[in-house]
């Protein structure tokens, strides 16, 4: 059975974090009922790099990619599978950028 909500996919998000960020010690993954965030643990940067997937009102999924300086990309959809696809894309991009610096 395909999971269709953030809270039902907690293990999937934790495994995604382990897969993309296993060699980066300064990252964390937090999963809530309507939101999941992978972020850089940084005491130096007040606006750390992160990728967020959030279920907003009217069943709209919003994905935000912060590059550590500003909001770099956003995406909104009503389709959960499309939201997951974009979330994975931005998570991979975040991991790649964190390895550079």
Named regions from a protein language model:
Residues 1-12, 65-101:
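Mixed-charge, Lys/Arg-enriched low-complexity segments
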Residues 1-45, 101:
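Negatively charged, low-complexity tracts enriched in Asp/Glu with abundant Ser/Thr
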